[in-house]
């Protein structure tokens, strides 16, 4: 995920945009940045969209005390929480129920949520276009339910 030289030619402008993108803290700022980039530089290449998506995902994960996100299997992510995460433990069972069959929770020395991001039941079926929206929806639910 990067800003190609063909999208923003000026190194100074590119550096400024990297700084501003790194400062994104929520969905509103993420949407504003997308609009600004399109207004100033035209349609975003896939690499820039990926960069913005990664920054939003990291920001939202940080807000719910996630210290590490790791891909486990093809359509499975592991969210490792900070050991002292201030989450509402009583809200974990309803969250597990909401994502029944797609979410697991364990307390290996630190709290870990394992999330199957794809809603597709068929193995091998390409559901990659839904990766980002499904993960963001899950992080939003974590924020609303647990924090």
Segments (PLM) and residue ranges:
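Accessory helical-bundle/CTD segments and flexible terminal tails appended to RecA-like ATPase motors
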Residues: 1-147
